[in-house]
Amino acid sequence: MSKKNIITIFLSAICTLPLWGGQQYYAFLKGDTLRMGNNYMERAMLWNNGAPVTVSLTDKQHGKTIPAQGKQPDFSIVKGIPTDATFTVNEIPTNGIHASYLQATVACTIGSLNIERRYRIYADCPAIACDTYLKGQVELYQNKEDNRSNADRKNIEHTADMATGVKTPTLDRLQLSGNHWSARTIEFFDYTDWNDNLVTGRTWLPYRRNTYRGNLLFAHDVVTRQGFFFLKEAPSSSTQLHYPGSDFVADFSDFMVVGLGIASHDVKPDSWTRVYGCVTGIYTGGEQEALTALRLYQKQLRHHTAVQDEMIMLNTWGDRSQDAKIDEAFCLAELDRAARMGITLFHLDDGWQSGKSPNSKTAGGSFKDIWKNTDYWTPNPTKFPHGLKPIVEKGKKLGIRIGLW
């Protein structure tokens, strides 16, 4: 046994203990089973040479376990046998913004691709996050869209018809037992200039392999009321990079998170490239319990501080004047009005800067190569001859913070 393996096994053994100020989170590898969790949940996985396969999710608060029958790795983008697998554990202390957490890193190499899966395990949280990093060379599978109309599909009469599918790179995967799953996906939209309906939900029964859009997937067994959720930590579906057309794939009780947010050329041989993240959480009950579990995870990412997280904002773009009105005199007058209205944050939108965006009231604006213009994000000397100092000083006097687009 190598020295490296001895160190890894030693770390695996000690991290079952509450060594970090009583924080109850753990991750350890024992035999062929990798376990990680806290007071709320545990995720158990077959080690599989460093390409873990989930075998169960346990809800410790209710004493219930969702068994899995996985054969494929949770994360899979290339074929091959994993080698050079390692497992390490580190505590990441709080930085004043996020809560402290245990980072369990599973690394392996498949062919010319190095993979690191960095799990984030928070105390007293019914969810475990995973950030994935890639380095080396990879040729990602390009899915050819099936453009057939549903009217052109034949009936399912034979087992072979049900086995058809596509190769799908997966961020995470739960290959579960049971035949009574009910699911709901939530899709979000941005670009409020174009969208006034920012959230849509779809409830569905998993059946034959199908795809779904959204950043959230909730699923529960309608008999046992045991449930789990996937949170895809990525932009909204309509604005993701290299979007494959969906975020989730379900095939009966096999649930997958898809869409890495990268292309093959984004993976470099000498630096790590991070793909979109994924969070897996558990709950028992209905919608309230599911949303509570999700919220408990979200509260780990950012400590709530009223001074910085709560605000009543006034924005200079609000009357659709674009950048035509914004200047020093206008902003000083707006601050007086903001104080009378109880505004706590005055936000200077597009137009305060020297660079001209394509949204300008006057022609000639552009975002092209703006990083090459070192003066782009400096105060416009014509509109703000004294810089932003008079605006900031008056804001402080009135108890109003100043924000910038």
Per-region residue spans from a language model:
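Aromatic-lined carbohydrate-binding/catalytic grooves of carbohydrate-active enzymes
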Residues: 307-405
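Generic cytosolic/nucleocytoplasmic N-terminal low-complexity/intrinsically disordered segments
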Residues: 2-4, 94, 231, 393
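Short regulatory "switch" loops immediately downstream of catalytic or recognition motifs
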Residues: 1, 133-143, 354-362
